[in-house]
Amino acid sequence: MNSLDLPGRPEATRVVVAMSGGVDSSVVAGLLAREGYEVVGVTLQLYDHGAAVHRAGSCCAGQDIDDARRVAETLGIAHYVLDYEERFRKAVIDPFAESYVTGETPIPCVACNQTVKFSDLLETARELGADALATGHYIRSRANGAHRALYRPVDADRDQSYFLFATTQEQIDYLRFPLGGMSKPQVRAIAEEMGLSVAAKHDSQDICFVPRGKYSDVITKLKPGAASPGDIVHIDGRVLGRHEGILHYTIGQRRGIGIAAGEPLYVVHLDAEHARVVVGPREALETRRLILRQVNWLGDFPLEELPANGMDLFAKVRSTRPPTPATLHNRDGSTWVELHEGETGVAPGQACVLYSDDRNDARVFGGGFIERSERCADAEALLSRLEKIPA
């Protein structure tokens, strides 16, 4: 086996590297080329429309494509640019806008990895005769029986496992993540040593197609009627003010709600059907149960074979939060997670990612998107009563 756990010498192994034009994927290409692998760099043109293409740090914009091309020239490897803009719009941007309109808070990076990078690009890599597709993600994979399993990376500050939970077993077996055992400073030092022009380049932003971070601008551009005004309502039923569209709000938000109140109020619910923003005290945010959809289970046995009383593991509901104790249940076609410690600011559309434990080298067991969450009994009763009140 070679360094990528593939049979044969590096010189007889073709690897496609997904090159975004950033330092991470550039170093992956450089390391593999230095080992003697036949490296083919592929850059995806995902978004080249309006102001976003001029945004500093936006992924796969014009400058990034030029940077990837220069790195490939420096390394002496083949490089191709593929126009995936239409696929990206249909698979990522349009669903992103639709989710906000329905009151959810989506994670477009998961959708991009799930559909474009690890589905379409992986198929392209196979068509090019590659033995593996390598990326610059900070996550580890290693052999686990007849397959490979995902693990959190050495650099906890760069851990991208939250955004990769939807990677299927078939994809994991074909993918390689050479940076999983490195820190970001090490990667930059290698880029400097190799003389790569991107050695000091800033990291790309998560949402590449949102100019200046104003996602509402993108949504209203794609869906002109999305910003429907409505009431800002207290969870107890009082109308406190008006808003210019639920797409401007997210669960757990406190600042910029647009009302004056004698107590701290948070967005606790987005009622898309009635165009209402529901606010309440912080305790109304506490969530204990998460009902999941589109679950991608990466355990060693089928999800249907979970014990009747569930499986204890750890769950992460935000990319910036550490995993916390939880119990996974699956019964009668439904999958849900019981959080042992309450979480606040849990929004539908976000991900709940599952881990073996809370250590830095924990195994990733997959996860799912949050369909809905259940609060404390008092908050659930108030929300249920509010839904029966006409707007």
Swiss-Prot record:
Matching InterPro entries: MnmA-like (IPR004506), MnmA-like_C (IPR046885), MnmA-like_central (IPR046884), MnmA-like_central_sf (IPR023382), Rossmann-like_a/b/a_fold (IPR014729)
Region named Interaction with tRNA: 158-160
Active site: residue positions: 112 (nucleophile), 208 (cysteine persulfide intermediate)
Gene3D superfamilies given in the database record: Adenine nucleotide alpha hydrolases-like domains, HUPs, Translation factors
Record's catalysed reaction(s): S-sulfanyl-L-cysteinyl-[protein] + uridine(34) in tRNA + AH2 + ATP = 2-thiouridine(34) in tRNA + L-cysteinyl-[protein] + A + AMP + diphosphate + H(+)
GO molecular function, a single term: tRNA-uridine 2-sulfurtransferase activity
GO CC terms in record: cytoplasm
Localization annotation: Cytoplasm
UniProt binding sites for ATP: 18-25, 44, 136
Record-marked site positions (Interaction with tRNA): 137, 350
Family the entry assigns: Belongs to the MnmA/TRMU family.
Alphabetical list of HAMAP family matching this protein: tRNA_thiouridyl_MnmA
Protein name: tRNA-specific 2-thiouridylase MnmA
Annotated gene: mnmA
